[in-house]
Regions:
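Short acidic amphipathic segments
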Residues: 148-150
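Portal/gating segments that form or line small-molecule/metal binding sites
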Residues: 1-146, 158-203
């Protein structure tokens, strides 16, 4: 499960605006590249992602390992499914009770599933030996609560939102994570990864 997050745990404000959360994607000199000369460019303005060297190495390694993205319908609608071309991975699974919009990018490998558990099963089938990346937020929280998330990745930005859309959605209950096994300082961002502690694990 992954997303960019404020220090107080929000991935967007109440109107789904990310404010300064994504500024670090454009604050450095090193482009994020993958697959040879292919550039990950989903800035909307064609400027591409240019980050610090530390962030570029971290993000490149993570994105290169992803085969499938799992996202909620709200994010799909906000970004129009990245116009059928996700930032990484070969497939996208959208958790939604509504089908794919008629005529929307028929060439794109987007799969609409109305249940989070079924979405994870489908994503694993599509991913093969590669990773399944779950977008944090309401859908990510449901998948985490169902015990279907192995790792929590957070790109923590030094800003306080105070309110908005939470990284962990409306999750109700306590879940323990292991100590972070990845801690990388970028420019205006701290990259963290935690394994999810399973029930019965002794501290």
């Amino acid at each position: 499960m992954h997303n960019v997050v404020s220090v107080d745990g929000f991935i967007a404000d109440g109107n789904d605006a990310v404010g300064p959360l994504h500024d670090w994607y454009f604050s450095g000199d090193t482009p994020i590249t993958g697959g040879g000369d292919q550039r990950y460019d989903h800035s909307g303005g064609g400027s591409g992602f240019k980050v610090s060297r530390a962030s570029a190495e971290y993000v490149r390694k993570m994105w290169d390992g992803i085969g499938v993205i799992v996202m909620g319908r709200n994010l799909f609608d906000l970004v129009n499914g990245w116009e059928g071309s996700p930032p990484t991975g070969d497939h996208v699974v959208v958790v939604s009770h509504r089908p794919k919009p008629e005529g929307w990018h028929p060439e794109a490998s987007y799969h609409f599933v109305d249940d989070v558990a079924a979405a994870v099963v489908r994503a694993k089938e599509l991913a093969g030996e590669r990773d399944v990346a779950v977008n944090a937020g309401d859908v990510g929280a449901q998948i985490l609560a169902a015990g279907l998330v192995d790792e929590v990745a957070m790109d923590v930005v030094p800003v306080v939102f105070g309110s908005g859309k939470r990284y962990f959605g409306n999750i109700d209950g306590q879940l323990l994570l292991e100590d972070p096994h990845v801690v990388i300082q970028g420019d205006r961002v701290l990259h963290l990864k935690f394994k999810v502690r399973r029930a019965g694990h002794d501290a």
